[in-house]
Amino acid sequence: MTKTSETTKIAIAHGNYIRGSASKVRRVLDQIRGRSYRDALIMLEFMPYRSTDPITKVLRSAVANAEHNLGMDPSTLIISSAWANSGPVMKRYRPRAQGRAFSIKKQTCHISISVESAPNKTNAEVQN
């Protein structure tokens, strides 16, 4: 999905029904939000969390959308926003002692990442 306005072009990618809780995905997204595409990929590669694999897939999809649909250069892209919302919960039951059953909640989430090109710095901004 792409969205264009007068000043900036934004490319968005969504990953729906990803297994894992939204709170665990958010702690990774908080670290890469506002970073460049290259820096975010390096960070995701070395983070010790299970949720980095689906986040990497969604990030690569957003960059591919920007490159193919909007003709943007991947080296100039930054992650403008990234969020995770909770999805449906799969309920399973585990047998326990004396005929009891404990419920197991297998959570899912929806991941969304949007990228845009970094603002060009003028000579005056670079010197300051």
Swiss-Prot record:
Transmembrane regions listed in the UniProt entry: none
Keyword rRNA-binding appears in the UniProt entry: yes
Record key words, sorted: Ribonucleoprotein, Ribosomal protein, RNA-binding, rRNA-binding
Top-level taxon: Bacteria
Gene Ontology biological process terms from the UniProt entry: translation
GO cellular-component term (any): cytosolic large ribosomal subunit
Pfam families named in the record: Ribosomal_L22 (PF00237)
InterPro entries named in the record: Ribosomal_uL22 (IPR001063), Ribosomal_uL22_bac/chlpt-type (IPR005727), Ribosomal_uL22_bac/org-type (IPR047867), Ribosomal_uL22_CS (IPR018260), Ribosomal_uL22_sf (IPR036394)
PROSITE patterns: RIBOSOMAL_L22
One example GO MF annotation: rRNA binding
Family: Belongs to the universal ribosomal protein uL22 family.
Free-text function comment from the UniProt entry: This protein binds specifically to 23S rRNA; its binding is stimulated by other ribosomal proteins, e.g. L4, L17, and L20. It is important during the early stages of 50S assembly. It makes multiple contacts with different domains of the 23S rRNA in the assembled 50S subunit and ribosome.
Quaternary structure (record): Part of the 50S ribosomal subunit.
Name of the protein this chain belongs to: Large ribosomal subunit protein uL22
Species, as recorded: Prochlorococcus marinus (strain MIT 9215)
